Amino acid sequence: MSERVISPEPVPDDADEITLRPSTLEAFVGQEPAKNALRIAIAAARKRGEPIDHILFAGPPGLGKTTLAHIIAREMGAAIRTTTGPVLEKTGDMAAIATALQNGDVLFIDEIHRMNPVVEEILYPAMEDFFIDVMIGEGPSARSIKLTLERFTLIGATTRQGLLSSPFRDRFGLLIRLNLYSPEDLEKIVTRSAEILRIPITPKGAAVIASRSRGTPRIANRLLRRVRDYAVVEGDGTITAEIAGAGLALLQIDELGLDDIDRRILSVIAGDFGGGPVGAKTIAISVGEEVRTIEEVYEPYLIQIGFVKRTPQGRETTPAALAHLKLNHSQKTLF
């Protein structure tokens, strides 16, 4: 599923994503509550002459968690070391990284919810008291060595906050939730990215792309690049509202940012099963996808926009979904 045009996860086409990232909070568009909290935390830490407190970013993928981590390090004048939860399999992996950190450094762990629980546990004293205990040797001769660490800031990013243990979450001084962006903020992001990439675009062209980006900057930037290609081939290179609409239609992305598989899922529930309820396994079989893909990739956005409801009996479509699909099926009434 990594090649899906409207996937919020990174795909190979996103090679210039780093170029488009803002480098300051001032340049970062949207997420005002998060930015306000970070401004205060950064200013307070700098006045005290201390590293900023540990921070956990939570929210859907593609909203700027990694970008904000780099901005924090930059505004604190700190070096940043980045890694991901899945690669931290052993305590030795974390010990090697932690002991190399200098005073004030930022350690950013993406997908922190996928970190080995054993590694998570050695972070407890590292986050609170800046030391870790490492076991040397095996069997009866094994012994614990205490390694003192420099004061550092841990920034974690997660799309599944509920998978983190309560003791781990409680050790973060700031827990910041990022939400889907408004069309207005996405329009600003598209316009900014077009300027950086030197893509001619009209305000209405930017608005069309923004409205179909599922509230996610990563998707907005990806669609901008795809529509740029269409504008060069089918137009004069300028992205107008008409060019944007036609280019996205060619990609089978409708006015709400739904693609063909999204619509097939809705059609299965609404058309084949009378509006539901229907189980995820049945939906997955009907559209030729895995259950996990349905639950983690497609379903969240359909729920967020109010097209699908989860019930104890299964998934149901809403009247809004039926109106979008232009279906007249009546939803089942559950007793």
Curated annotation (Swiss-Prot):
Binding site for Mg(2+): T66
PANTHER family, per database record: HOLLIDAY JUNCTION BRANCH MIGRATION COMPLEX SUBUNIT RUVB, PTHR42848
GO biological process: DNA recombination; DNA repair
Official protein name in the record: Holliday junction branch migration complex subunit RuvB
Reactions it catalyzes: ATP + H2O = ADP + phosphate + H(+)
Keyword DNA-binding: yes
Keywords: ATP-binding, Cytoplasm, DNA damage, DNA recombination, DNA repair, DNA-binding, Hydrolase, Nucleotide-binding
Region (Small ATPAse domain (RuvB-S)): 182-252
HAMAP family assigned: DNA_HJ_migration_RuvB
